[in-house]
Amino acid sequence: MKAKTLSRHLREGVKNLSRNGWMTFASVSAVTVTLLLVGVFLTAIMNMNHFATKVEQDVEIRVHIDPAAKEADQKKLEDDMSKIAKVESIKYSSKEEELKRLIKSLGDSGKTFELFEQDNPLKNVFVVKAKEPTDTATIAKKIEKMQFVSNVQYGKGQVERLFDTVKTGRNIGIVLIAGLLFTAMFLISNTIKITIYARSTEIEIMKLVGATNWFIRWPFLLEGLFLGVLGSIIPIGLILVTYNSLQGMFNEKLGGTIFELLPYSPFVFQLAGLLVLIGALIGMWGSVMSIRRFLKV
């Protein structure tokens, strides 16, 4: 496209915005509210994924070995478990190591258990991790049936509920965001339709004298682009300011736990870029949907 032609399309796009001032304001306001909600939902979903990933990384199967099992029996059990599909790693932990872990995890209260160092009631353990955390329950059920297994612990019931909750939350978030984006496209499309109705005779004349569809389409595409980008400015500003404060408060109270928010950078800048891109795309798509029927003379 020639620079002169592009300049003409840009001028027309800006002129279209000023011709319908109130509708432009209404559309930008609607896109602003929509993208703000999209930004909030994306922030919530991405941080929820962050929490879920941290939890998933901590999900493990603790296989307590039958005290009657000899060293050769333990080796066979380890070999059998390693043959299970989707097992990522198997780590042996002696009962002495298990007691130390218990004492450490309980802090000051754990000192009471130091009395058991001479007569340790705990069992030797294999710590098994799945390649995909969602396969933990399936792997645990297979291990339970093996010889020389005293019992298996992996948070039965809680793990399944956790994964179901995370999956449901993600799906709900996706549906809500899709609905909001559709609403924004509908509003932009209606705004541009008003401009096109006002210029329908001009468009027909341009078609009759040989103007290509794209020559006619470009100013409206740019108008939609401008509407979408303008609508993203306020949501980005609000997210940049509020996320910093929210992260400080959140991490001050829950720092060091799995419930730490994503780092301010690069998260907010990635989100800002995504909102600009979403705004531009829904604006241009709204334009495409509104103008196509007018390109037939």
From Swiss-Prot:
TM segment ranges: 25-45, 172-192, 220-240, 271-291
Sorted UniProt keywords: Cell cycle, Cell division, Cell membrane, Membrane, Pharmaceutical, Transmembrane, Transmembrane helix
Mutant phenotype after disruption: Vegetative bacilli mutant cells exhibit a distinct morphology in which individual bacilli appear kinked with frequent curves and sharp angles among chains of bacilli. Grows more slowly than wild-type bacteria. Affords resistance of vegetative B.anthracis bacilli to human chemokine CXCL10 regardless of their growth phase and to murine Cxcl9-mediated bactericidal activity. CXCL10 treated spores fail to germinate and resume vegetative growth indicating that FtsX is not required for the ability of CXCL10 to target the spore form of B.anthracis.
Stretches in topological domain Extracellular: 46-171, 241-270
Membrane topology type: Multi-pass membrane protein
Pfam families from the UniProt entry: FtsX (PF02687), FtsX_ECD (PF18075)
Subcellular location: Cell membrane
GO biological process: cell division; chemokine-mediated signaling pathway; positive regulation of sporulation resulting in formation of a cellular spore
Known function: Part of the ABC transporter FtsEX involved in asymmetric cellular division facilitating the initiation of sporulation.
Subunit and interaction comment: Interacts with FtsE.
Protein name: Cell division protein FtsX
The species this protein was found in: Bacillus anthracis
